[in-house]
Structure formats: structure tokens, C-alpha cells
Swiss-Prot record:
GO terms for cellular component: cytosol. PROSITE patterns: MGS. Pfam families: AICARFT_IMPCHas (PF01808), MGS (PF02142). Belongs to the PurH family. NCBIfam families: PRK00881.1 (NF002049), purH (TIGR00355). This is Bifunctional purine biosynthesis protein PurH. It catalyses: (6R)-10-formyltetrahydrofolate + 5-amino-1-(5-phospho-beta-D-ribosyl)imidazole-4-carboxamide = 5-formamido-1-(5-phospho-D-ribosyl)imidazole-4-carboxamide + (6S)-5,6,7,8-tetrahydrofolate; IMP + H2O = 5-formamido-1-(5-phospho-D-ribosyl)imidazole-4-carboxamide. Keywords: Hydrolase, Multifunctional enzyme, Purine biosynthesis, Transferase. Pathway: Purine metabolism; IMP biosynthesis via de novo pathway; 5-formamido-1-(5-phospho-D-ribosyl)imidazole-4-carboxamide from 5-amino-1-(5-phospho-D-ribosyl)imidazole-4-carboxamide (10-formyl THF route): step 1/1; Purine metabolism; IMP biosynthesis via de novo pathway; IMP from 5-formamido-1-(5-phospho-D-ribosyl)imidazole-4-carboxamide: step 1/1. The IMP cyclohydrolase activity resides in the N-terminal region. GO terms for biological process: 'de novo' IMP biosynthetic process.
């Protein structure tokens, strides 16, 4: 290895790396700020303009886009015609490229960043050099990650060159990196244009965690997050204590957080297998947790609990009495953390309940991807319609609105029975609506008397209304829209139940 081209925005570790290269007899070529850094460190360096015989121009937009650079990168060492061609133009081969790119992603995250600032942080020369070097990895070593500096130096010391396997691995890493870089730019500009579903989509994710296994032990898995994760998401969570999260933990935690984010008042959400098993609302977080626990004392065992307010000592004492996989909250008081951390394996996570919700949902199918707007539609209850003779009382309406927030997060067909403070029965995932209703009503038992019922979609027949009435339900909320709405309304009138139509469906598959 004779020549290295180094041009980096992130200069961490670059000086000792370059010093070692010089000790190994490698000539360093560099640009702008990187060159100045080397000169200050006393490292011999050749300026890029001395190689190209052309000055930087357009405020630095054009520096390395030159045949003297790309010819030296792309020439195949095993092809005589290539080597003769670069020799004829006094171009020397470049054996090592070390480049990291302008911080576009970091730039667009800054508050108040302008489009012009973002545009000026789109790197052109850097990706071009990386791609040229990576294409010719048979002869050229390319480094885009400082974590690979030591590997390259070790192989150079031991063999005088990097191995083919290392060059191939680093080239693949470069193409992933440049693809991800371009994807962030494409997504940023696409959002500015207002296109939601363009003809081509590009998304990039970073591996956050290797997982022991997936949904089942025979399935391999890893957890990837968006470059800029939403603040109130599992992707942005910080783990304070406990074992590593599993695949199922992450999915359940995501489901719990989505429900907790529906409420501004103190709420506790218990989830099993991505369905809520208990949701409680209270004047304080202790009351909210106790309501969630009482909603289903059996199913909460081994579950995930999300709370939207700080966990205090009293709440922690209650939670420490049962086995929970995960507790997620904005924060834990010092005393609460001490109480809960006595359990070695419990996972304690913090998530700031702030910021926006995911605007798009992505679901993979074999050979494709379904993308839809998230079910975060802000409903105006003023548009709801009472269609029965009996009007819901103020207390019933409060309960209906609370359960309506919850039912949309239950797998369809979904029925939720509850009050304004808690769920009392949840019927999820049945292939017919009456089946889900019977499960929810049976779970609620005697507590169904005086409670309300929420349905994520319309009633195809009046049997659910009749079952609800016989169990003691006093008010129902549902979208409406069935050709048999009149029959369901008549059944409600027969039993003196109030019914509210929202005209908004909340299927969840």
C-alpha cells in the first residue's frame, strides 16, 4: 500500500491513524480541513490540488471530482490497458480511501435549520470517492467507519496489505452507508415536496441491537431503528436496568406505548401479546396502575406495563409484588428505582412522552411493503351522533370516549367493556364480532352492569347489542355504517341503551 486519500468530517481518531500509515511508508493525500488537521499535527500530507493540478472551486463544492482522483481509484491493477491509460495521463493509483461524509442527518435535526443549510450539507465528492473505491475493492481498501481503523492497521502491519475478505466486507459497508445517506436526503426532500406515496420509496434503519432470537427461538432477529427515532417510541427508549430486550418485548412495549400516548391524564397500560389486558386511568399514577392491575389480575402477570407519568415509590411497591417483564415510564423516582431494581431481570425503560406520533405505518408482505397513514386521526367528538332514544349521561360519555381510545389498539374484531377509569373486559382477534363481545362481557362479569362497550367496527347484526344489554351495558360507541344499523339501534332502544356513532372505523389487523 503506497497512497491513501483521507477526507473526513468526523476527525476523531484520524490523526493517530494517519501517523501509523506514515510510519508504514504510506503517502497521505488530503483535502481542506483534514489537510489542515494533519499539518497541525506535523503529519506529511499532499494537498488534493497538487494531485489534480486544479484548485478547489465553488466554495469547496468541487474538490475531488477529477480524473486524477477517480482514475487512480477505478483503474484495475490486473488490466494492462487500465494501467497504461492512467500512466499516459500521469495518474498514480490510490490504494486506500478514508472518507466520512458531511453531517446531513445531524444538520436537519437542528432546530430552525434552513433548506439552504441542509442542501450545503449534501456531500457529493465524498460518496463519489467511496463508491469508486468500493467498486474496485479487488485492489482498493475503503474505510467509512472509524471502528475499522484498527483492523486496517493490523493487517497492514502483519501482511503489508489488507486481505481480500476485509476489502470486500468494507466495500459492502460503504455501499450500505452511501445508500443510507442518500435515503435520508431523499426522505427529507420528499417530505418538503409533500409527497406521501411517491413512485419509489427509500427508508434507512440502523441496527440498534442484535437479538437472541425472534418471535420464536428458531428465528434469528435484530432490532433496527430510524436514524432519528420518535421521542415517544420504543426506538428511543433508554434501558436503565434488567436483561436485554427480546423481540417480543420490543413489539409488546411498542403496543403499550401507543395506547399510553392516547392519554394526557395519568394512565397505566398492561399488554400481553400486543393486545392490552388492562388499562387504568387515575388522578395519579398509583391509582392508574391499580386500576390497570384490577382490570385483569391474571393476564397482567408476565406482561409489559407502560405509564405516562413518573413512577413513584408507592406505585413501585405495588408493581414489585408481581412478575412483570418490562416497566416503561418517563422517569422513575430514586426510591422507586431502588425498589424495582431489586428484581435482577425486570427491564426498566424510560421514554420521554413528548413529540409527534409516527405518521406512516409500514407492514411487510412477501415481496412487498404496505404503507399507510397511521391511525392517529384526531377525531372531533362534536361530529359523533347519538342515534338512540336514550342520550348518554355525562359520565357515560366520558367512559365511552375513554374506551374508544383503547379499542382502536385491540386486534380486530375488537370489543372493549369498561368505565371512565378502566377496562373491564377485552375481546380481541375473533373472526366474528359477537365472539369478541362474549369474551369481553364474560371477562367483565358482574362489573359489566352499568359499564359501557366500544366496538372498533360496525355491528353486522344486532346480536352484540342484545348480548351487551343482557349483561348490563348502558351505553355503546361504534362507527356505524352497517346495512343493519337500524336493527342494532332498535335493539338498543328496546333495552334502553344509548348508542353513539363515530363514523370512524378502527380496524387493526
Amino acid at each position: 500500500m503506497k497512497r491513501a486519500l483521507i477526507s473526513v468530517s468526523d476527525k476523531n481518531g484520524i490523526v493517530p491513524f494517519a501517523e501509523k500509515l506514515v510510519e508504514l511508508g504510506v503517502e497521505i493525500i488530503s483535502t481542506g480541513g483534514t489537510k489542515a488537521t494533519f499539518e497541525q499535527a506535523g503529519i506529511p500530507v499532499t494537498g488534493i490540488e497538487d494531485v489534480t493540478k486544479f484548485p478547489e472551486m465553488l466554495d469547496g463544492r468541487v474538490k475531488t471530482l477529477h480524473p486524477a482522483i477517480h482514475g487512480g481509484l477505478l483503474a484495475r491493477r490486473d488490466t494492462a490497458e487500465h494501467m497504461e491509460a492512467i500512466a499516459a495521463h500521469d495518474i498514480e493509483p490510490i490504494d486506500l480511501v478514508v472518507v466520512n461524509l458531511y453531517p446531513f442527518q445531524e444538520t436537519i435535526q437542528k432546530p430552525g435549520v434552513t433548506l439552504e443549510e441542509a442542501i450545503e450539507n449534501i456531500d457529493i465528492g465524498g460518496p463519489s470517492m467511496l463508491r469508486s473505491a468500493a467498486k474496485n475493492y479487488a485492489a482498493v481498501t475503503v474505510v467509512v467507519d472509524a471502528a475499522d481503523y484498527d483492523t486496517v492497521l493490523t493487517e497492514l502491519k502483519e501482511h503489508g496489505a489488507t486481505t481480500f475478505e476485509t476489502r470486500q466486507r468494507l466495500a459492502a459497508k460503504v455501499f450500505r452507508h452511501t445508500a443510507a445517506y442518500d435515503a435520508v436526503i431523499a426522505e427529507y426532500l420528499t417530505k418538503i415536496t409533500g409527497e406521501t406515496f411517491p413512485e419509489k420509496v427509500t427508508f434507512t434503519y440502523n441496527r440498534k441491537q442484535a437479538l437472541r432470537y425472534g418471535e420464536n427461538p428458531h428465528q434469528d432477529a435484530a432490532f433496527y431503528t430510524e436514524p432519528v427515532a420518535l421521542l415517544n417510541s420504543i426506538s428511543a427508549a433508554k434501558q436503565l436496568h434488567g436483561k436485554e430486550l427480546s423481540y417480543n418485548n420490543i413489539r409488546d412495549a411498542d403496543a403499550a406505548l401507543k395506547i399510553a400516548n392516547e392519554f394526557t391524564e395519568p394512565v397505566a397500560v398492561a399488554v400481553k401479546h400486543m393486545n392490552p389486558c388492562g388499562v387504568g386511568v387515575g388522578e395519579n399514577i398509583e391509582e392508574a396502575y391499580l386500576k390497570a392491575y384490577e382490570a385483569d389480575e391474571t393476564s397482567i402477570f408476565g406482561g409489559i406495563v407502560a405509564l405516562n407519568k413518573e413512577v413513584d415509590a408507592k406505585t413501585a411497591e405495588h408493581m414489585s409484588k408481581i412478575f412483570l417483564e418490562i416497566i416503561i415510564a418517563p422517569s422513575f423516582s430514586e426510591e422507586a428505582f431502588t425498589i424495582l431494581a431489586k428484581k435482577k431481570n425486570i427491564r426498566l425503560l424510560t421514554v420521554p412522552f413528548a413529540g409527534s406520533v409516527e405518521s406512516l405505518e409500514k407492514t411487510s408482505v412477501n415481496g412487498g411493503l404496505l404503507i399507510q397513514a397511521s391511525d392517529s386521526f384526531v377525531e372531533d367528538s362534536a361530529g359523533y351522533e347519538v342515534v338512540t332514544e336514550k342520550q348518554p349521561t355525562e359520565a357515560e360519555m366520558k367512559a365511552l370516549l375513554a374506551q374508544w381510545k383503547i379499542v382502536k389498539h385491540v386486534k380486530s374484531n375488537a370489543i372493549v367493556v369498561g368505565s371512565d377509569k378502566q377496562t373491564l373486559g377485552i375481546g380481541a382477534g375473533q373472526m366474528n364480532r359477537i365472539g369478541s363481545a362474549l369474551i369481553a362481557l364474560e371477562q367483565a362479569g358482574e362489573k359489566a352492569k352499568g359499564a359501557v362497550l366500544a366496538s372498533d367496527a360496525f355491528f353486522p347484526m344486532d346480536d352484540t347489542v342484545e348480548a351487551a344489554a343482557k349483561a348490563g351495558i348502558t351505553a355503546i360507541i361504534q362507527p356505524g355504517g352497517s346495512i343493519k344499523d337500524k336493527e342494532s339501534i332498535a335493539m338498543a332502544d328496546k333495552y334502553g341503551i344509548s348508542m353513539v356513532l363515530t363514523h370512524v372505523r378502527h380496524f387493526k389487523h
